[in-house]
């Protein structure tokens, strides 16, 4: 596996935030393979700041990277910078959240985000014959938008399921708590919360506990993160999470990167399926780590 050429291949990676173990898990997979090849990976954390991410990309380009792996903070404001990267002859792979103009990029590796939302909605409709639903969103990330749309489209034709409120929380636990509190303070009654990811579901759980609603409200997330899997087994309020596999996303990303560099054929779009984890099938999963 070791790179016998004298030239080390340089990879640059920037994820919307490293304040989410999901992205750490994606990056670890990539890093392992890069290290095995004797190549180099530079990883950057823009901490949800699109301007900072643009600067980091320019910095990575100046380090002489051959491939940029990007998980965009915002799906459209990044396009201008990516065009410059492309002009410099650098390969661009987008992971987990697409960019709005996929003509600029060489490959997009994502979970089936729309289906993740569909799975949660279908499970909810099987469990409850009617529901008033609050949504916690991240409107600037296309992956999150796809999940919310999958959920909304599934319940849209059935009047027993009403979406009664929604707030943006950037997919962060510490912003999800006040976001759901805001819906509660508006006097809106709801019995289900659909969260764009598991960190958001943690914030939602904290909010319903704070407001003594943990026996009346049920929460769905997306990710299949270790802490939500543990809570699925232990709490009544967390009902399900549509699980992504950051290990698969990382493996697919770096596999396609080396294919490009070796001028082999590759797919421009790779979609990794998601699976719903519930109380009924939680024993089948390792709750200490990611899948």
Model-inferred region functions:
Residues 34-46, 132-137, 155-174:
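Short beta-strand elements in bilobed, periplasmic/extracellular small-molecule ligand-binding domains
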Residues 22-39, 116-120, 143-161, 175, ...:
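Short, solvent-exposed amphipathic alpha-helices that sit
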Residues 75-115, 126, 132, 225-234, ...:
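Flexible loop/hinge segments that line or gate small-molecule binding clefts
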Residues 10-29, 33, 37, 41-55, ...:
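Extracytoplasmic "Venus flytrap"
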Residues 67-85, 151, 164-165, 170-230:
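Hydrophobic alpha-helical
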Residues 1, 154-155, 245-291:
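Hinge/cleft segment of the Venus flytrap/periplasmic-binding protein
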Residues 53, 109-133, 145-146, 173-180, ...:
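Hydrophobic alpha-helical segments within soluble ligand-binding/sensing domains
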Residues 1-9, 83-90:
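Short, low-complexity disordered leader/linker segments with a strong preference
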């Amino acid at each position: 596996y070791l790179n016998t050429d004298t030239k080390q291949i340089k990879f640059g990676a920037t994820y919307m935030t490293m304040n989410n173990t999901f992205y750490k898990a994606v990056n670890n997979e990539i890093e392992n393979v890069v290290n095995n090849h004797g190549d180099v990976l530079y990883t950057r954390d823009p901490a949800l700041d699109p301007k900072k991410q643009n600067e980091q990309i320019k910095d990575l380009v100046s380090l002489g990277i051959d491939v940029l792996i990007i998980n965009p903070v915002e799906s459209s404001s990044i396009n201008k910078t990516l065009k410059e990267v492309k002009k410099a002859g650098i390969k661009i792979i987008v992971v987990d959240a697409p960019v709005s103009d996929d003509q600029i990029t060489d490959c997009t590796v994502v979970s089936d985000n729309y289906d993740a939302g569909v799975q949660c909605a279908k499970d909810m409709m099987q469990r409850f014959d009617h529901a008033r639903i609050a949504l916690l969103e991240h409107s600037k990330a296309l992956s999150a938008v796809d999940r919310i749309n999958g959920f909304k489209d599934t319940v849209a034709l059935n009047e027993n399921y009403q979406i009664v409120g929604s707030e943006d929380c950037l997919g962060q636990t510490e912003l999800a708590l006040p976001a759901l509190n805001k819906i509660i303070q508006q006097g809106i009654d709801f019995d289900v919360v659909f969260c764009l990811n598991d960190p958001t579901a943690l914030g939602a759980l904290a909010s319903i506990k704070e407001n003594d609603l943990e026996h009346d409200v049920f929460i769905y997330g997306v990710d299949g993160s270790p802490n939500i899997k543990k809570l699925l087994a232990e709490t009544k309020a967390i009902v399900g999470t549509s699980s992504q596999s950051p290990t698969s996303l990382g493996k697919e990303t770096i596999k396609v990167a080396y294919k490009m560099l070796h001028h082999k054929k590759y797919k421009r779009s790779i979609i990794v399926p998601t699976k719903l984890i519930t109380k009924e099938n939680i024993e089948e999963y390792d709750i200490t780590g990611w899948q």
